[in-house]
Amino acid sequence: MEDKALLTEAYQLVSDLNKAIQNCKQGLPDDLRLQRNIDEILRELKKAEKLDNALLIELESFYQRTSLLIGLGSLKLNDQARTAWRNYDKFHFDHVKHTLTLYGPVFGL
């Protein structure tokens, strides 16, 4: 998949997630954290001109923070939001994980 198409798809999937979570917000701190995560990555994706490792690291960071909030946080996602998250999750594993390059020593925990 070419860079521009990948950026467009990532932006669309995160936008879909953003729209879906608007219907299940409860005003909890985790809702605010998730919204902040989404806003940050949408801003980064919008200004990105090419797919480089810095953007891949941003996408990975977004994925890790959001995954933690959804898995262990107090978020109550409806079916639409859960489906939107699963769609992004699949995209992330198919297109981001294997392309991301980490530098320096990496230790498994």
Identify the meaning behind each predicted range.
Residues 64-109:
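Amphipathic alpha-helical binding modules
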Residues 1-39, 100-109:
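Short terminal alpha-helical segments
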Residues 17, 27, 59, 92-95:
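Non-transmembrane alpha-helical oligomerization segments
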Residues 21-72:
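Amphipathic alpha-helical interaction modules
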